[in-house]
Amino acid sequence: MFEFSDRLKVLPPYLFAELDRKKQEKIEQGVDVIDLGVGDPDMPTPKPIVEAAKKALENPENHKYPSYVGKYEFRKAVADWYKRRFDVDLDPNTEVITLIGSKEGIAHFPLAFVNPGDIVLCPDPAYPVYRIGAIFAGGTPYTVPLKEENNFLPDLDSIPEDVAKKAKIIWINYPNNPTSAPPTLEFYKKLVDWAKEYNVIIASDNAYSEIYTGQEKPPSILQVPGAKDVAIEFHSLSKTYNMTGWRIGMAVGNKELVAGLGKVKTNVDSGQFGAVQDAGIVALNLPEEEVEKIRDVYRERKKIMTEALEKIGLEIYRSDYTFYLWIKVPEGYTSAEFVGRLIDEAGIVCTPGNGFGEYGEGYFRISLTVPTERLLEAAERIKNLKL
């Protein structure tokens, strides 16, 4: 009999894999399931990107091993996009690396800088991979609560001095998944000062920067003067361009941090398929009005679903960011109990807040990644539960 390693034994079932299992179980029972669980856009990748990939498939250069750090042309496109979008200067040779989706980079990054016993500061509730990556690297995850009364921003002053001194990395993610909370440059400035004081690496996950339904564009932490001294930022084409299945992302920022991640990657993978990078170049140069069309869809969905659920009496954290709604569970339920009732009695898959950590208890998350008519159908089914 074979036994899992200790590092695997301490991991809970991966949240989204468990949701998928429950969904498939209901589908096999003949239930018309509405999946509002995983943040996987239902819209197609814009056609110019697909056409670029088709053309790139014919290029024999893309049939060979790719560069470990990514094609220069893709890294240059990333640097140019950061300059246009955030007015941040990046050297494509030393401050940009191509990822096989940002999840891969996030999971691998701690391996470059965390020694056994080092502390990794992980927000809670949060994307589970921050904590998982720390565990795989032999680090000790330390929970930094994100509370609604603080607009789901970490309270840096509450981190004990001895913990801060032992910390190697602090993870942040704004616009935030799962809460949809926005970032502020004021918070980023305070965080950069704090990180410099304690010599802590800031690892920023900015995957949702282009998914906003208001007029205020989310910033990058790299806009803060001096942030590049301590920060690396992970980004992805998945959410912005409906490319979750393409697995293409990037990490940018401090050149030593980028180089460390690169050293891990050269030893564990062989880079991203060249044709996908060629398509990524087209994505990064897509006219802004094309991305705005995608945002318009989420604007409509968020408005309609927020109104429908608030009429039922559900309390929603109002935000102009991400394609999620972060909602308080009705009184008398835990997160798991309520989400369990939704799938069992209404055929709706949602994500329990406690799946993102203990401070997510009392909430659930829905993804606005199905057509409007399905969202309204979901709202009607919830209404019929007579909560």
From Swiss-Prot:
GO MF term list: L,L-diaminopimelate aminotransferase activity; pyridoxal phosphate binding
Name the catalysed reactions. Answer: (2S,6S)-2,6-diaminopimelate + 2-oxoglutarate = (S)-2,3,4,5-tetrahydrodipicolinate + L-glutamate + H2O + H(+)
Top-level taxon in the UniProt lineage:
Bacteria
Give the EC number: 2.6.1.83
Pfam families membership: Aminotran_1_2 (PF00155)
Q: Which residues bind substrate?
A: Y14, G39, K103, Y127, N177, R365
Enzyme class comes to transferase
Pathway the protein acts in: Amino-acid biosynthesis; L-lysine biosynthesis via DAP pathway; LL-2,6-diaminopimelate from (S)-tetrahydrodipicolinate (aminotransferase route): step 1/1
Q: Does the keyword ATP-binding apply?
A: no
Q: Which residues bind pyridoxal 5'-phosphate?
A: Y68, S102, K103, Y127, N177, Y208, S236, L237, S238, R247
State the family named in the UniProt similarity comment for this chain: Belongs to the class-I pyridoxal-phosphate-dependent aminotransferase family. LL-diaminopimelate aminotransferase subfamily.
Could you give the subunit structure recorded for this chain? Homodimer.
Protein function: Involved in the synthesis of meso-diaminopimelate (m-DAP or DL-DAP), required for both lysine and peptidoglycan biosynthesis. Catalyzes the direct conversion of tetrahydrodipicolinate to LL-diaminopimelate.
Record's protein name: LL-diaminopimelate aminotransferase
